[in-house]
Amino acid sequence: MDGEAVRFCTDNQCVSLHPQEVDSVAMAPAAPKIPRLVQATPAFMAVTLVFSLVTLFVVVQQQTRPVPKPVQAVILGDNITGHLPFEPNNHHHFGREAEMRELIQTFKGHMENSSAWVVEIQMLKCRVDNVNSQLQVLGDHLGNTNADIQMVKGVLKDATTLSLQTQMLRSSLEGTNAEIQRLKEDLEKADALTFQTLNFLKSSLENTSIELHVLSRGLENANSEIQMLNASLETANTQAQLANSSLKNANAEIYVLRGHLDSVNDLRTQNQVLRNSLEGANAEIQGLKENLQNTNALNSQTQAFIKSSFDNTSAEIQFLRGHLERAGDEIHVLKRDLKMVTAQTQKANGRLDQTDTQIQVFKSEMENVNTLNAQIQVLNGHMKNASREIQTLKQGMKNASALTSQTQMLDSNLQKASAEIQRLRGDLENTKALTMEIQQEQSRLKTLHVVITSQEQLQRTQSQLLQMVLQGWKFNGGSLYYFSSVKKSWHEAEQFCVSQGAHLASVASKEEQAFLVEFTSKVYYWIGLTDRGTEGSWRWTDGTPFNAAQNKAPGSKGSCPLRKYIIVNSGMGACSFIDTPPCPWILSN
């Protein structure tokens, strides 16, 4: 209450009611004041109750008060004559007659106005019905808005889920980048190791070429010696034909020459073995070069692909970040719009309650009005109130139209958000596909790493074999043999072989025996046949059992040199313990 004006405030608008001839003034939106609204509502109800009681009292007084006699006379006239109850020649009564006529005209005008007011009241009722229907439509729109709000909440939950998935993808991409960096470092290490292996192979090849050059010179010298021996043989044959007396000397010389020929044959065999080993080494080196070229090409392709994939991944991540930021902004705008819609909905509900209260009061007052004067007074007051309410309803309709436009804007924003979510889902699928490709590339890189490791192991094995071949090792049947030039006792030779991770040679087949005989000539070599610890039960030192059925018993105790063993197994004698000077040995690996 402020003087003669009454103010009603909602969350963001205030309406003031003034006395007659003063219109309602719509004040500027004020800040929400819930305590003032709580205080104004009881005051408004009290004022409405007092106004209704006063109106009821006036109506009762109008019904109980008798009509003045002059007015009855004016209205009804004389019951007998039907004329006015005054004399025409009386000037005083003539003036009263004019006044009464004027009063009658005024009353008729009021009656006509009352009929017009009845029409306006009917129009107001129609408008009230229209307002009720519009309020029902507004309630339906509010229900649809609530459904849209629930749908927006679901979309926001989906957006939250997408943001979590995007964070997971970021963490997986960071792990993938770290794995790619580690693989790059491994590739650099592999390239460095390959370069070192290449240098080692080049140096080994140079050494091999030098040794082959030396061997070729030795072969040339051997060929010249063979030619000289052929000439000597021709001379010896001529001398044998000419003189039988020199036959013994010639036979002796031939025997010596045959020994030289055996040496030459051994040299030829060694030369052939070296040539085969060299050809194999050249083929392996060529294969290694091709493998290195393929590995370098594959490394370059892999690096280019990984770089392009990383660039594409970074661009897509930036793109996703931008979209997520825009989605966050749109979600913030939607939240703000939802808050505005909620506030406007509450305001509309308050106005609807006020409108219902006003309509109920209007109906009760319309039922209680019985006289024309009371109807005029009440209608004047209610016309003003109705105009105020109409203005309020118009403002509510404007707000409803604004709410409808905001609802449409929310629908469009929801459609945009749905399209954005669909596009984000597509981007997520693309990111998943990219992750699968990265995993495939990682598996390929792991396979390449395994291949490179196996190639490095093969290169190391080949390098070791090449070094062993260059050091004088012989290859036969998947095993390597080393014919020593240092003489030791059998026990010392065995201990040396065990310290090198090998053992004295064992004869497991006729082919192996033939191979060993080919390189031993007339020199004794220790082999790994022994009965130490098991008197009379012979065995090989590498654990291979000695087959007594296929081989004849070696004889008495002791370890047997190779030539003795061969003689024993040919049935030419027995292998006994030999107290001779130390012999060289055959190392088998």
From Swiss-Prot:
Residues 476-589 form the C-type lectin domain. GO terms for biological process: endocytosis; immune response. Residues 1-39 are cytoplasmic. SUPFAM superfamilies: C-type lectin-like (SSF56436). Pfam families: Lectin_C. Keywords: Endocytosis, Glycoprotein, Lectin, Membrane, Receptor, Signal-anchor, Transmembrane, Transmembrane helix. One of its GO terms (molecular function) is pattern recognition receptor activity. The chain crosses the membrane at residues 40-60. GO terms for cellular component: external side of plasma membrane. Glycans are attached at residues 79, 113, 207, 230, 244, 312, 385, 399. It is a single-pass type II membrane protein. InterPro entries: C-type_lectin-like, C-type_lectin-like/link_sf, C-type_lectin/snaclec_domain, CD209-like_CTLD, CTDL_fold. It is found in: Membrane. The keyword Protease does not apply. Residues 61-589 are extracellular. Receptor with an affinity for galactose and fucose. Could be involved in endocytosis. This is C-type lectin domain family 4 member F. It comes from Homo sapiens (Human).
